[in-house]
Amino acid sequence: MTKQVEIFTDGSCLGNPGPGGYGVVLRYKQVEKTLAQGYRLTTNNRMEMMATIVALQALKEPCNVILTTDSQYVRQGITQWIHNWKKRGWKTADKKPVKNADLWQALDKETTRHTIDWRWVKGHAGHRENEMCDELARAAAENPTLDDTGYQPAE
């Protein structure tokens, strides 16, 4: 029987771009696990995406996932926009390269392993797990240890 897992994610950036971090809460039955990491220079959207990728990668087998994010960018990107991006060879409707294509491709790969119900929650609205993720992400952003090698400054 496929495991039912709940995932909550958030990304944070101190400046955009700037130091950033992600926070994740994974829940299986009554057990919760948290993940967080900070990056020296990145963007908020990249951290929101990184949170979902890392969370899905942490699952050792295919699962039924309820994934809750406060990022419409992530939720709409993976459920709506990505289909046309892939058809166009990772280009937008106006023929420009898709921003954060490295992470969209990684997220797309992870989503094929699982059955995912993508949910959105308003950030900073008292949602327990979202607040936990926000605190984890902020703390990670305040103490960044990694380089976001895929980050490309806007021109």
UniProtKB/Swiss-Prot annotation:
Annotated binding of Mg(2+) 2, by residue: 10, 134
Compartment(s) of residence: Cytoplasm
The species this protein was found in? Vibrio vulnificus (strain YJ016)
Q: What are the annotated disulfide bridges?
A: none
Source taxon at top rank:
Bacteria
Per UniProt, the cofactor note for this protein states: Binds 1 Mg(2+) ion per subunit. May bind a second metal ion at a regulatory site, or after substrate binding.
Q: PANTHER family from the xrefs?
A: RIBONUCLEASE H1
The protein's annotated catalytic reaction(s) are:
Endonucleolytic cleavage to 5'-phosphomonoester
What name has this protein been given in UniProt?
A: Ribonuclease H
